[in-house]
């Protein structure tokens, strides 16, 4: 009864929102993304047909790469840190807190996971250590932005810069260099028979982190669509006054969402370094912009966990294709692939006008504010 009353109060308090305008924006956003997806599928179909007809042409080579099991396996592996960070970004931003410090959370968790694994000898202990480090840094970000009402963009950049300096420095102090020694990597999980399939077999013979990602995407979707907590997060980002009127703490919901973003980003960073067995801290570190691509992914996915995952898989797939083509002697500049996600989102934003950004994202809120 209490929960139902809260839902009614939230609906009544938010009745003045421009529903028609928001609905129009939503339809436009999804229509454009559907058009982009349909165009991509059609282009892939044409390429595969051309490759089958002319196997010795560049189309044939591309078709061979696209249907390669190794390409799918590589795309899944590359998508892990980006997709986990994207899920974390969705939770934070849907609650009204813009967390652009995802890059920093990936960096700190990637280093800590390797360090704890090297210290204890336990891969999963290291994984948990990386998640805890990311969550602590996210907690610091939450205190600064929610409690002290700091600018969220500046605070997010500070998180990135802190991690960018701290992780290589710690590696230098502990290991006398920006790169850590190698540690054991987790064994792949293989499903008998299914793992032998020509292309989709890569789905059934992968690192545990890939299956953990699948589970996290499904659970994130369920939380947003089927739970009261998910509705509270959406209300906190769309109409915090309605949530406050219903008797739910906006501050508490935002703290929980930001900490959850730290957990998810930490899972991505830990899995990334542990799957490779090493942390490299040269330059922008091994993370190298994946946290920023995660932001692009959830924007392109319109703040939907499944959409963000599919966007991530698309971007990671382009990177995987580029890698395979390089191995086959067809050079495509890596920098060109790296800017593709950002170009795609700019095009989508130009066509749609804007993504369905939460109304109160970036705004501070105190209980009782008018």
Where are these regions (language model features)?
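Transmembrane alpha-helical segments in multi-pass inner-membrane proteins
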Residues: 279-342
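Cytosolic-side transmembrane-helix boundaries in multi-pass membrane proteins
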Residues: 1-50, 220, 246-252, 325-370
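Short loop segments and helix-boundary regions at transmembrane helix junctions
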Residues: 27, 93-98, 137-193, 286-289, ...
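Inter-helical junctions in multi-pass inner-membrane proteins, predominant
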Residues: 65, 70, 224, 257-296, ...
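Single transmembrane alpha-helix segments in multi-pass membrane proteins
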Residues: 69-127, 131-132, 137-153, 299-303
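Helix-loop-helix "hairpin" substructures at the membrane interface of multi-pass membrane proteins
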Residues: 78, 205-280, 305
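Helix-loop-helix hairpins and the membrane-proximal interhelical loops
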Residues: 33-81, 87-91, 280, 366
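Transmembrane helix-bundle core of multi-pass membrane transporters
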Residues: 164-224, 333, 367-370
């Amino acid at each position: 009864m209490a929960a139902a009353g809260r839902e009614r109060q939230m609906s009544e308090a938010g009745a003045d929102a421009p529903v028609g305008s928001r609905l129009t924006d939503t339809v436009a956003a999804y229509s454009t993304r559907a058009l982009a997806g349909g165009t991509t599928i059609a282009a892939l179909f044409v390429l595969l047909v051309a490759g089958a007809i002319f196997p010795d042409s560049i189309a044939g080579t591309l078709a061979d790469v696209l249907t390669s099991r190794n390409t799918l396996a590589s795309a899944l592996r590359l998508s892990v840190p980006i997709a986990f960070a994207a899920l974390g970004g969705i939770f934070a931003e849907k609650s009204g807190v813009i967390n652009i410090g995802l890059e920093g959370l990936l960096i700190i968790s990637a280093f800590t996971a390797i360090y704890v694994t090297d210290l204890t000898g336990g891969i999963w202990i290291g994984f948990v250590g990386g998640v805890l480090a990311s969550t602590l840094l996210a907690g610091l970000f939450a205190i600064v932005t929610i409690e002290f009402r700091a600018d969220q963009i500046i605070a997010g950049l500070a998180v990135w810069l802190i991690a960018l300096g701290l992780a290589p420095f710690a590696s230098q102090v502990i290991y006398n260099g920006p790169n850590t020694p190698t540690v054991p990597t987790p064994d792949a999980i293989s499903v008998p028979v299914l793992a032998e399939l020509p292309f989709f077999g890569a789905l059934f013979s992968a690192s545990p982190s890939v299956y953990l990602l699948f589970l996290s995407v499904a659970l994130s979707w369920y939380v947003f669509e089927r739970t009261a907590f998910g509705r509270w997060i959406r209300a906190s980002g769309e109409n915090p006054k309605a949530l406050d009127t219903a008797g739910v703490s906006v501050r508490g919901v935002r703290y929980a969402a930001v900490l959850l973003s730290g957990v998810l980003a930490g899972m991505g960073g830990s899995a990334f370094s542990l799957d490779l067995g090493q942390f490299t801290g040269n330059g922008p570190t091994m993370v190298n912009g994946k946290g920023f691509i995660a932001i692009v992914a959830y924007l392109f996915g319109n703040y939907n966990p499944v959409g963000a995952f599919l966007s991530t898989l698309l971007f990671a797939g382009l990177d995987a294709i580029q890698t395979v083509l390089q191995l086959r002697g067809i050079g495509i500049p890596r920098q060109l692939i790296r800017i593709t996600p950002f170009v795609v989102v700019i095009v989508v934003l130009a066509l749609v006008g804007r993504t369905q950004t939460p109304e109160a994202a970036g705004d501070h809120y105190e209980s009782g504010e008018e």
